Amino acid sequence: GRIRRSQREHGSAQTQGRWAYTKRLNTELGKKIAGAIVRYAEENHADVIVFEYLEMQGKISGKKKQKLHLWRKRDIQRRCEHQAHRKGMRVSRICAWNTSRLAYDGSGAVTRDWENHSLCTFQTGKRYHCDLSASCNIGARYFIRELLKPLPATERSLLEAKVPPVKRRTSCVYADLRKLHSEMELLKAA
């Protein structure tokens, strides 16, 4: 806003310093966030850091191409990946579709609170934090993928028949992971 307004009034040459300052500030913020993520993962002895695969390609058209995006998702994920590999951790990306939209308990779509956008209401009436629910769903999708990947096709299709939502990863939630795990335990016991 402020830089663009100044650029419109005084020309682009005078505002180059402001753009450079904002860019440096943004880069520094990306470094700090990536470092904090990897440090947190290392403190908790994590083997894998799981990110949502966010759409990071494509060009911005119109007036918005002048706008400097303050959320550096690509830079943060890239820096995290380099730092994690240096420390012997893996980085995995999960499809971001419906992670925030679906409740982790399997009750269906959530309704966001109008006053506090970080809270949501499940179909069951329970109020919960949206980002925490989305984090549960992201972790569940990763574990569902890792549990099903090494299985033979016949065993995998048997489990997918018993727990149908795991067939389509964009609708997987934490409740589906729990069902899948219990079905796998029953299959091992038999």
Each PLM stretch: what is its role?
Residues 1-190:
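Positively charged, helix-rich recognition surfaces that bind polyanionic ligands
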